[in-house]
Amino acid sequence: GKGSGFGLNGRSLQNQGSVTQECNQEGVVVVRIAVDKNGSVIAAEAGVKGTTNSHPCLLEPAKKTAFMHKWFSDSNAPSKQVGFVVVNFKLGE
């Protein structure tokens, strides 16, 4: 699924990845993430509030997609900044 990130006080997304699901499900999975000063995702929890399909075969690829996201580094950012990645899965992708 394709992901979009938000909630990091205006930090810009540098790179995002996409992991394909192994089943034929559709829906949105919201992943709560923690990002360090370097812009790397250091923690991810898939299936938080806003998720429309919490099928296990979507949660794992959503979490992997979130870990592939990278934000630009920010030396003024907290050591652990919380945000979200919303991954939209469509049938057949």
Say what each PLM segment does.
Residues G1-N24, V28:
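Intrinsic-disorder/low-complexity signature in envelope-associated proteins
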Residues G7, C23-V30, A34-K80:
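A short, well-structured alpha-helical segment
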Residues L13-N15, Q21, A44, V48, ...:
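Generic, low-specificity signal for short hydrophobic/alpha-helical stretches with a mild N-terminal bias
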Residues V82-F84:
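C-terminal partner/receptor-binding element of secreted or periplasmic proteins
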Residues V86-E93:
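Short, low-complexity, Pro/Ser/Thr/Gly-rich segments in the mature regions of secreted, periplasmic
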